[in-house]
Amino acid sequence: MTKRLNNVSALRCLIVVLFINLIASQAVSAGERVFMWKVDSPKATAYILGTVHMMRKEIYPLDSRIEKAFKRSDAYALEFNIDDVTNIQMGTILSDVSYGGDDTIQKHISKETYDTLQKKFVEYGFPIEYMTKFRPWFLAVTIETLEYQKLGLDPRYGIDKYFLQQAEGKKSIIELESFDSQMDLFRTMTEKDQELFLVYTLNDLEDGRKNLDILMTAWSDGDSKIMEKVMFDPLKEDRQLSRIYEKLFYERNRNMTDKIIKMLAQKGTYFVAVGAGHLVGKQGIIELLSHKGYAVRQQ
């Protein structure tokens, strides 16, 4: 999603923001721990890195422990490879994010939500009429993207993208998810949940800015407890969000864990990069692997 919201750039920003988990970092410290875990099986080793999908150029190179783990790996696994999305798939994005015919967002959200949305886009310098054809979930993602771009974050410097560029032509690349599965997250979202997602996004912008420094420090210090608290405390305050958390986090965590376990059954060294929010908490990938009997050690 750029300020012009053309098809291709909109999709790219959409994908990075969906799975960014709203984390950012300005620098990587050489502290006691990094946001990476090592998992061993009789046949394989996997390094699992919590990533940030929008970053700043100056944070590279990353901590040497992360860089060395990537270099010694045989394969690179990420959520999904945006570079492999076909033109046909790109072309379908417009029908997924917008209403057809004379339909507009006013028919699908409350007047209160619409008025708040209108004020926000006036602030961005966009005429609201330009945005009325888009679905609530897409506008929520757009707003998140614009807010983080204002803070200097850029999807071109996302950590998963950084390693993908190094892996291409040199390592096997494994997708833990797919373009269609990620789009299905929103295709199957009810109108009620879409509006809830949009309202939460609009109401959380100020707290999101305040939490950015906390998340930045948690990521660079490898502090999974603080990361979990900031990312998942909103669920304690509003149980209506449980359906959205289940769809965007927990269900995906279970599926990606199954894929990682399959990798661990095959000989090799794997470098796995997923959004940092997928690793933390009782339903995060690290805990799920531990419950399956794997020894997981933070690096």
Please place each PLM-identified region on the residue numbering.
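Bacterial N-terminal signal peptides
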Residues: 12-24
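Structured, acidic catalytic/metal-binding patches in enzyme active sites
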Residues: 36, 40-47, 52-244
